[in-house]
Amino acid sequence: MGKTSKDKRDIYYRQAKDEGWRARSAFKLLHVDEAYGILNGVQRAVDLCAAPGSWSQVLSRKLYDTCETDDEKSAVKIIAVDLQAMAPIRGILQLQGDITKQSTAEAIIGHFGGNEKAQLVVCDGAPDVTGVHEMDEYMQHQLLVAALSIATCVLETGGTFVAKIFKGNATSLLSSQMQIFFKKFDIYKPPSSRPSSIEAFVVCSDFCLPEGYIPQVINPARDDIRLLAQKTGSEVNRRLVPFIACGDLNGLSDPEEGKTSSSDESKSNLEYVYDAVMDDASYPLEFKEILKQVYDEQRHII
C-alpha cells in the first residue's frame, strides 16, 4: 500500500493496515458482498489479476477460514491468477498465467477437477493509468473483455462475475455486452472507492451462455477476432465475438444513420487520443508505439 499523506488520512488505508489487508481495495470487494451477497454459498472462486492479493485475502477469510471442519475446507477451492507471484495466502491456490491465453482457462478448470467450474469470478485488474481519460477507459475496457472471455470458459451456469471498470462513454455499450451472458447486470461504486476516481464495478449474476455460443479466450489487442470467431464454426460466435471485443455495431442500425460530411466530426475517441498523443513530444516513444499498435489493430478490425 502507498504511504503518501493522502493515503495516511484515508480511513480505509488505516483500517486495512490495522486488519492485515494487503491493500485498501479489500474493502471494495467486502462492500460489493455487503450490497449483493456475492459470496453466499460459494465454494469455488477465481480471482483474476490477483496481485498483490487483497481480494484473495477476502475470499480466503470469507470462504475458507469460516469452515468449521476439514471436510468443509477441502470442498473450498479458490484460485488466484496473475502474471506475478504473490506471497502465500491460506486456502488459496496460486496460478501464474496470462488471462488472455486458453491454457490458463484450462489450468483453472483442471484445478477444480471433474466437471466442476467456478461459482464466482472476480477481477480487480487495471492497466497503468496514462492520465488520458479516453485512453485509460479504452485500455480498461479491453482488459475487462479479456476477463469476461476467460470467465465464460470457467464459470458454471448461474455463476457471478465482478470486475472493475472505468466509467465513461463506453459504459452503455459495456452493459449491452455483459447482458449477452448474464441475466442480471449492475454497476456499483462502493463507499471505499475514492469519490475522485472514475472506477466502479460491474456485478453480473445468473451466468448463461447464449445457445450455440462456444466460449473463447480473447485478447482484444492481439487476436484477429473475426478469424477467431470463424474458427469455432458457430454462427453465434461470428455475430457476437466482434461486438464483445470491439463494440462492433455493424448491421445493428441504419447504415445511413450518423453519416457526416465532416471527417473531423466522424472521428472516434481513440482517433482523437491517437492524434493528440502522436503530436505531443512529452509522451515517451514506448507509449506511442503501444498506442500505435492498438490503433492499427482497431483500424484493421473495422
Curated annotation (Swiss-Prot):
Transmembrane spans: none
Principal subcellular localisation of the protein: cytoplasm
Span of the signal peptide: none
Reactions catalysed, as given in the entry: cytidine(32)/guanosine(34) in tRNA + 2 S-adenosyl-L-methionine = 2'-O-methylcytidine(32)/2'-O-methylguanosine(34) in tRNA + 2 S-adenosyl-L-homocysteine + 2 H(+)
Catalytic site positions: K164 (proton acceptor)
Entry GO MF terms: S-adenosyl-L-methionine binding; tRNA (cytidine(32)/guanosine(34)-2'-O)-methyltransferase activity; tRNA (guanine) methyltransferase activity; tRNA methyltransferase activity
Family matches, as Gene3D superfamilies: Vaccinia Virus protein VP39
Residues engaged in binding S-adenosyl-L-methionine: G53, W55, D82, D98, D124
Pfam families: FtsJ (PF01728)
Gene Ontology biological-process entries: cytoplasmic translation; neurogenesis; tRNA methylation; tRNA nucleoside ribose methylation
Enzyme class: transferase
Disruption phenotype: Impairs long-term memory functioning with no apparent effect on short-term memory. RNAi-mediated knockdown impairs small interfering RNA-mediated silencing and leads to derepression of piRNA pathway-mediated transposable element silencing. Simultaneous knockdown of Trm7-34 decreases lifespan.
Keyword Transmembrane: no
Cellular component aspect of the GO annotation: cytoplasm; cytosol
EC numbers, comma separated: 2.1.1.205
UniProt keyword list: Cytoplasm, Methyltransferase, S-adenosyl-L-methionine, Transferase, tRNA processing
Protein's cellular compartments: Cytoplasm
Entry-linked InterPro entries: RNA_methyltr_E_TRM7, RNA_methyltr_RlmE, RNA_MeTrfase_FtsJ_dom, rRNA-MeTfrase_E, SAM-dependent_MTases_sf
Protein's UniProt keywords contain tRNA processing: yes
PANTHER family referenced in this protein's UniProt entry, alphabetically: RIBOSOMAL RNA METHYLTRANSFERASE, TRNA (CYTIDINE(32)_GUANOSINE(34)-2'-O)-METHYLTRANSFERASE-RELATED
Function field: Methylates the 2'-O-ribose of nucleotides at positions 32 of the tRNA anticodon loop of substrate tRNAs. Plays a role in neurogenesis. Requisite for RNA-mediated gene silencing. May modify position 32 in tRNA(Arg(ACG)), tRNA(Gln(CUG)), tRNA(Gln(UUG)), tRNA(Gln(CUC)), tRNA(Leu(CAA)), tRNA(Leu(CAG)), tRNA(Phe(GAA)), tRNA(Trp(CCA)), tRNA(Val(TAC)), tRNA(Val(CAC)), and tRNA(Val(AAC)).
Family statement: Belongs to the class I-like SAM-binding methyltransferase superfamily. RNA methyltransferase RlmE family. TRM7 subfamily.
Name of the molecule in the record: tRNA (cytidine(32)-2'-O)-methyltransferase
Protein's organism: Drosophila melanogaster
Gene field: Trm7-32
